[in-house]
From Swiss-Prot:
<keyword id="KW-0808">Transferase</keyword>
<feature type="binding site">
    <location>
        <position position="47"/>
    </location>
    <ligand>
        <name>S-adenosyl-L-methionine</name>
    </ligand>
</feature>
<feature type="binding site">
    <location>
        <position position="114"/>
    </location>
    <ligand>
        <name>S-adenosyl-L-methionine</name>
    </ligand>
</feature>
<comment type="function">
    <text>Specifically dimethylates two adjacent adenosines (A1518 and A1519) in the loop of a conserved hairpin near the 3'-end of 16S rRNA in the 30S particle. May play a critical role in biogenesis of 30S subunits.</text>
</comment>
<keyword id="KW-0694">RNA-binding</keyword>
<comment type="similarity">
    <text>Belongs to the class I-like SAM-binding methyltransferase superfamily. rRNA adenine N(6)-methyltransferase family. RsmA subfamily.</text>
</comment>
<feature type="binding site">
    <location>
        <position position="20"/>
    </location>
    <ligand>
        <name>S-adenosyl-L-methionine</name>
    </ligand>
</feature>
<feature type="binding site">
    <location>
        <position position="22"/>
    </location>
    <ligand>
        <name>S-adenosyl-L-methionine</name>
    </ligand>
</feature>
<feature type="binding site">
    <location>
        <position position="93"/>
    </location>
    <ligand>
        <name>S-adenosyl-L-methionine</name>
    </ligand>
</feature>
<dbReference type="InterPro" id="IPR029063">
    <property type="entry name" value="SAM-dependent_MTases_sf"/>
</dbReference>
<dbReference type="GO" id="GO:0005829">
    <property type="term" value="C:cytosol"/>
</dbReference>
<keyword id="KW-0698">rRNA processing</keyword>
<dbReference type="GO" id="GO:0052908">
    <property type="term" value="F:16S rRNA (adenine(1518)-N(6)/adenine(1519)-N(6))-dimethyltransferase activity"/>
</dbReference>
<dbReference type="InterPro" id="IPR011530">
    <property type="entry name" value="rRNA_adenine_dimethylase"/>
</dbReference>
<keyword id="KW-0489">Methyltransferase</keyword>
<keyword id="KW-0949">S-adenosyl-L-methionine</keyword>
<dbReference type="InterPro" id="IPR020598">
    <property type="entry name" value="rRNA_Ade_methylase_Trfase_N"/>
</dbReference>
Amino acid sequence: MSTRNDVHLGHKAKKRFGQNFLNDPYVIDGIVSAINPLPGQNLVEIGPGLGAITEPVGREIDKFTVIELDRDLAARLRTHPELGSKLTIYEGDAMRFDFTQLIQEGNKLRIFGNLPYNISTPLMFHLFEFHKDIQDMHFMLQKEVVNRLAAGPGTKAYGRLTVMAQYYCKVMPVLEVPPTAFVPPPKVDSAVVRLVPYEVLPFPAKNLKWLDRVCREGFNQRRKTVRNCFKALLTKEQLEALGVNPSHRPENLTLEQFVIMANWLNDNYQAESTESA
């Protein structure tokens, strides 16, 4: 048996795919309990890997979908004695995947996975595009990313990812996971988070490009005051009229305030609103 710490169940972890395989039964049980898979639901796993979560989920339901980039792992799943007949396997990159092809009428997507940490943030931004068709998402992520997703205004972790995630979803941390739960162990702590897209957005933006732009401009200069961050777009008087304190820092602004600024800019800078952020 190999003594390498990057080999698990005969498969060598591929660094280019950011592979860290979960192998702690207690953690796996906690994740599956949080997902609570039920027969008939439209479940989708991103990056099933060697099946640590896939297998116990498969014991609860008859059919579900997996998306796997690593062709060797996809091949293993196709010939898996228990899972093979239950899985619809898409071999490819989840960041380019069109999740609308998995939509079933009256049966929203339930997406879960142990995401490669090197792509987790852009992948979540991709998934937010399908928020109307998603019931919930459960992801293993870097603990620092979960902290950012769940952060509140006025904290160091609060940033663009926070605002955009909370624009679309309720964010609920589920459990923390140590490096020892993986093969090979990552260099950081991990955590599981539940993201539940809103049926009705609490603070809808008229143009998401403006919301993204005010977030980028604010958080790229987070030590500056709001007045200085947005001086090219909004005057002190305009900020005050919108209920935004010009002397605050961007990290003190709420999601609602970012949306209010974005909507004002959309209404008053129609020509600019089509520009890419």
